């Protein structure tokens, strides 16, 4: 269970870092830059811990898939990005893929 907590922290940190990239404004704003650097350092640090016991393919699929979904949603609410039907379908397919991996994959740790 601890590994999934670390994975959740990694995903959240990556989402904060990625969505803060837009606010950096050409490196002219230091606080968003700190969020970017700190977020990525935290995200990858947590991924290192998670990958000690969980399969790399499963971890990366969950991390990247949920990261894409959450970054898209944050961009929609914070930056006013519009998601067209194709984007919403894609997000739905990503969520479905993560669920399939979580519920039905027999991948084991190394």
Swiss-Prot record:
It comes from the Bacteria. This is Multidrug transporter PA4990. Confers resistance to ethidium bromide, acriflavine and methyl viologen. It is found in: Cell membrane. It comes from Pseudomonas aeruginosa (strain ATCC 15692 / DSM 22644 / CIP 104116 / JCM 14847 / LMG 12228 / 1C / PRS 101 / PAO1). It holds the Pfam family Multi_Drug_Res. InterPro entries: Small_drug/metabolite_transptr, Small_multidrug_res. Gene3D superfamilies: 1.10.3730.20. GO terms for cellular component: plasma membrane. Keywords: Antiport, Cell membrane, Membrane, Transmembrane, Transmembrane helix, Transport. Belongs to the drug/metabolite transporter (DMT) superfamily. Small multidrug resistance (SMR) (TC 2.A.7.1) family. GO terms for molecular function: amino-acid betaine transmembrane transporter activity; antiporter activity; choline transmembrane transporter activity. Its main location: membrane. The chain crosses the membrane at residues 7-27, 31-51, 58-78, 85-105. SUPFAM superfamilies: Multidrug resistance efflux transporter EmrE. GO terms for biological process: choline transport; glycine betaine transport; transmembrane transport. It is a multi-pass membrane protein.
